């Protein structure tokens, strides 16, 4: 039996649901066709694990401070946040559950926005001592 690839915890926990979500989003209007309703925009989902090495999870206050200082200034037009629960299987066979936060951003797909998103990811990893922040990009038809 092959050993699993050394992926980060959050990647393992969310791979299948994210692939399914990505496939559904792409089939909605990501095939190069014009949107029947609304306009095509880029959609980025960011998955932030809340567990830390010292067993003290990222608090709601710390999370909101991060959003207020790192995310909102870069995406002033708005964003969506929600709580999520993931799980992943460690190499030793132990099933681990982890609470997380998800941010959904709609944007124009510019290099500047992509860099802003990568900066947000790096700031979170640095501030909260995380291995990774999962990023999923797709296109969606958006109407307000």
Could you describe each region identified by the protein language model?
Residues 30-32:
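Bacterial signal peptide processing site
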Residues 41-60:
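Terminal, regulation- and interaction-focused segments at domain boundaries
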Residues 62-100, 105-112:
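Mature extracytoplasmic domains of secretory-pathway proteins
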Residues 95-144:
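Helix-rich interaction surfaces within compact, conserved domain-sized segments
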Residues 17-23:
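Classic N-terminal secretory signal peptides
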Residues 2-16:
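Bacterial N-terminal signal peptides that target proteins for export
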Residues 24-28:
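C-terminal motif of bacterial Sec signal peptides marking the signal peptidase cleavage site
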